[in-house]
Amino acid sequence: REEKIPLFFAEEAAKRDWKHFGMIPEDTKYNQSHATIYEQDEAVGHSVRAVYMYTAMADLAATEHDEKLFDACERLWNNMTEKKMYITGGIGSTVEGEAFTKEYELPNDMAYAETCASIGLVFFAKQMLKMSKNGKYADAMERELYNGIISGMQLDGKRFFYVNPLEVNPGVSGEIFGYKHVIPERPGWYACACCPPNLVRMVTSLGRYAWDEDDDVIYSHLFIGQEARLKKADIKVVSEYPWKGHVSYSITPKTGDEFAVAIHIPGYLKSFEVTLNGMRLKENGETNADVIYSCLLYTSDAADEL
């Protein structure tokens, strides 16, 4: 046995004479146990299992300040979002094992793109933001929330999609072998009902994904209307996003300590402007797809309108 394989899984399988890792016996890629976490550089196997594990990896990297582990997370992130993700943010392109397949193999009409996988990608993105305030992670959260996740629930909250295809063909989707998982209409429930409660959990906990706060900076990741009670300030956000581009922040500092507010500017914007109490601070700012947080320094005890 090679020294670098994840020994726990191999040893337990030998003890139990049990070799089922997924759809195929000995398919260790199904549950991402084919290599150590430091050596993985391609998103493989069951997509939900994958992003949940990557979330734990990123959390551990941030907690332990483990740059090597963060580098592994970054490699997996880049492979998944640049080569294995639909334009909607959907991941996991095949029903076979609910899994990732080959790079750029993203069929519209046979897509799996499980709702739980998109939710898991938001979990992963939020943990990556702990280590690096790179705008691409917040961009991914936004893409999922407005596309890959919200499609999983009907507007009245009573019917759900487990699978989120980009193309549905009446008479083919849900009927013909290879397309039976692509259901044309949202069912009321599922025998394996992981997605509906997971989606509800996401919607009811959006606040934790919208903000981060460290010693001297408050980070706003998402343009979600809300009232946030943070350590340094109370912030009310009134948002017309995504229908209109206007978002206002009413910021009431709680202490006289100096702090900054850093607002994520989506990487796809061609331009933006920032005003403070009606005074223009930035006009026609250009965005960078990799890193863009517009920062404003606060020293006042008075409330401000941004």
Give the predicted meaning of each segment:
Residues 298-306:
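Single conserved hydrophobic/aromatic residue that forms the stacking wall/gate
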Residues 1-297:
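Glycan-recognition and catalytic cores of secretory/periplasmic carbohydrate-active enzymes
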